[in-house]
Amino acid sequence: MYTNYMSWQKKLFFGLLGGVILVVLLIVAVAKFGQKKEPITITYWGLWEPEEVIKPLIAEFETVHPDIKVNYVFQSQREYRERLQNALSQGRGPDVFRIHNTWLPMFKSELSPVPFTEFESIYPPVVSYDFRLGSNYMAVPLMYDGLALYTNDELFDQGGKTIPTSWEELRKTAVELSVCDSVDGRCTRGDKILISGAAMGTADNVDHWQDVLGIIMMQNNVNLSLPQGQSAEESLQYYTIFNRADHVWDSTLPSSTSMFAAGKLAMYFAPSWRVFEIKETNPKLKFSVHPLPQLPLDISRGEKPTTWATYWAEGVSKKSQNTTAAWEWVKFLSSKESLTKMYQTASGIREFGEIYPRIDMQASLINAPYVGPVVSQVANARSWYLTGFTFDGPTGINTKISNYFADAINSINQGRQPSEVTKTLSAGVNQVLSQYGLATQLAAPAN
């Protein structure tokens, strides 16, 4: 009987002990479960889009992801690339940031690979090419832009001209639409230019001259990494002929954007974002936007038009402590729904929003004023490190390469032999590219 009593007491003790332990565990679990998790904050450096365009998307994202907060910091383009790289190198940079499509060589060591699949089926070939690094993609675009031909409607109507579709037509039209302060109004002797037919030929006052020369060379099958040989020489001669022989453009004139906005320039090359500046400067100016002229194409040989892309994309810092959350934000922004909302909001404060980068959305803009011609060129677009207005600063890849091409333009205008000019140009370009592991072995020109 005593033994049974002791056994009963032991069972009671362990039962009570087990109950206490269970209660304690339940209390701890409930306390832990009920404890509010501190949200993650990701910092997003943006360009071009004001806070009022991004804020509604942040609110929507944070509703769906209550554990993630987004801090949007609108950046000035001035010294942006240097400021961004310095911050990233010092470990105090943003989680998400915007880079130009030509900046991958400068940022490849700072970027976290895109974790999404089906990249190539969503974006046009130029995007896949620009941001591919090995087997990975390194940034996701929320917009697209490219070089287009702007024309002054009134000058074309007065001259009875049609929009040129080839470079030879463009040159002929430029000469015929130009007006100089001469006896007969023609511009054959270098008289003061009153109305210019086309802004081409110089490197100091033609906005986006890099893009214009770049596309002329690409269409002429010039290897921009090794710009020498007959095709490169011909391209430089064609670009400069508007200054040195046709006298329809010179360095005494204001910038091409200012001339076009003033109604004194018939043809002008620029991306779509220049529409905003032109409209603001001269709301009454009647102008149109068109696809780029092309060199003659042999369709039977499979030759296709070549156009020029210049756009921006979102990357995630490799040093971010919250790469998963950062990519979740970029994935949300790059969805069809978010891009549509962003475009609509932006269109409420300016002429139009940023052009959709996704293949499955571009058809909706193909007939839109100003942007339609840019969209129509996406499939055949290419790009390179000879791009204007990337704001990459004096040590940026575009600026350094542009300096060598500007010297080449000036040398041709001063009468130097094209073969000597391109030899110097190739050496300079090669020197810049070698800093990024992109140099091409210098050799005798193939043509």
Task: Name what the model sees in each region.
Residues I99-A148, R171, C187-G197, W209-V212, ...:
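Hinge/lid segment of periplasmic solute-binding proteins
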Residues A174-V175, V222-L253, L292-L295:
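Glycine-centered hinge/linker elements that transmit conformational signals in sensory
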Residues V64, K69-N71, Y137, Q158, ...:
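Extracytoplasmic/periplasmic substrate-recognition and gating elements
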Residues E60-V126, D130-R132, E154-T165, A266-M267, ...:
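Extracytoplasmic "Venus flytrap"/periplasmic binding protein-like
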Residues A368-N430:
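C-terminal capping/gating helix-and-loop segments adjacent to ligand/active sites or protein-protein/ligand interfaces
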Residues E49-K69, I401, F405:
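Short, polar/charged alpha-helical segment
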Residues M1-T43, N430-N447:
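Short, low-complexity disordered leader/linker segments with a strong preference
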Residues E38-E49, I68-V73, D95-V96, M138, ...:
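Short, well-ordered beta-strand elements
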